Amino acid sequence: MSKKLTRYIAIYGIGVYLLALLVISIAFRDHALQLRWMLWGIGEVLFFFVLTTIFYPRWKNDDPKSFWRKVFWVALAIRLLYVLFSYFYFEHNMGFHFDSPGDGVGYYNRSVRLSRYIRRGDFGYVIDFIRNYSFGYSDHGYLIWLTFLHTLFGRGVLVARLFKALMSAYLCIVVYKLASRTFGERTGRLAAVMCVFMPILIQLTGMHVKEMEMIFLSILALERMDFLIRSKKYTFWNIVFPILLVGLSFGFRTVIGMCLIFAFLVFVILSPSNLVNRKGKIITLSITVAVFLVFLFTAIGSEMKIIYRINFSGTDYMAKRYESIGLKYGELSKSKYLFPGAFVLPLSPMIEEAPVHNKLIHGSTYIKNFLAFFAMLAIVIAIRQKRWRDFSLIGAYELSYLAIIMFTFTSNSERFHEPAIPLILVMAAYAMTHLRRKDLVLFYVYCGLLCIALFAWNWLKLAARGLV
């Protein structure tokens, strides 16, 4: 992608955000965002588009080792600075070291409590607590991880966040490897640079929730699966490591593990014969099915059945919930209406009535809304270029995860969409590096529709509460 085109897309990205924010703030001036949230959002949008535009042209022609070093160390420096900044910012503005009194505080309190019992040698209490006072296997992973850190390093919150910063920085390298092998060097480098400056992947390092670890495990698992098949190096470690990562992923969110297994099956089936011959496909599929059955007859399997039984039968859950608390237009939250916007939703909240966490990341949410066009276009380009087989691992994972999220009661939650963001960056980078002039017409139309959709989304939030 040329430097001129990079700037062109960045200008549109910034312009659409500022226009939408201005129109919404004027139209709903009694409910406009406070100045601090506006500045947060503007800062997030400018940070991503301006720095991506500056650094991608500078780094795109470096030799691979030099590129890796720059990506990792710049990403790590940014994330370490944000961890320290957010620590004091939350303390000053929220009264404690968390962005909101939600899940992060709960995970912290439980893990600190368990670490005290471990130091006393009371392992029986710890096992009993994890078994009886957590929400199933998918709630165990993060709690055990935090408990381990607090046992070694004490009750401070910074150590866990420093590890998040390290994971987030290395994630940029993992994204580069996966994107480069799938779509080529240009795409891999652009995806890595966007990953370095993607605000939400930075902001998650300053939050005490499990999304950063979950994202890291899932993308690393995909990269190792991709390496296993493309390298044809079927060593013990190359086979066991992806299985281990999938197992760990189940400990953070059940659907992540399910989608990883599904994506690998699709990738193997659709791989051309020069990658996996017929005999290799039979062996690989047999091993994958065997691993799946092992998972199925454990606590993981019980949760998979619960996911299927409750989530997919409860696609109208949010509509009923909104109606029960007196909100209007709950009908529109049904999955059949939301599913077509799986890549785009949820849209950025630009009104004061949104939760604090959502206002804090509303600029990041907008960037995802904007890049969703290129992610969707990537599917068209892959088919157009007859590269859909190369795209099968990434596509199967992303589409299956988004489909599950959109057909459950989590379809409106930003947090549940965050694991999809790294692959949206990969897909967007692929589309941007293979744009045709004709594609820009669709891009202009999308920018206009996005402005209208942002206005309608925020109006709907106010109208549902009877405020407009």
Spans of model-derived segments:
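Membrane-interfacial entry segments at the cytosolic side of transmembrane helices
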Residues: 63-70, 233-240, 272-289, 436-448
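Transmembrane-helix signature of polytopic, membrane-embedded enzymes
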Residues: 158, 175-197, 392
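Hydrophobic, aromatic-rich transmembrane alpha-helices
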Residues: 52-54, 341, 345-388
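Membrane-interface alpha helices of multi-pass inner-membrane proteins
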Residues: 202-203, 237-260
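Short acidic/glycine- and proline-prone juxtamembrane loop motifs at membrane-interface regions
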Residues: 206-214
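Transmembrane alpha-helix segments characteristic
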Residues: 14-20, 76-79, 241-244, 386-406
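Transmembrane-helix motifs of polytopic, lipid-linked glycan transferases
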Residues: 55-57, 162-182, 374-378
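Membrane-interface helix-loop-helix junctions at transmembrane boundaries of multi-pass membrane enzymes
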Residues: 176, 181, 231-237, 277-279, ...
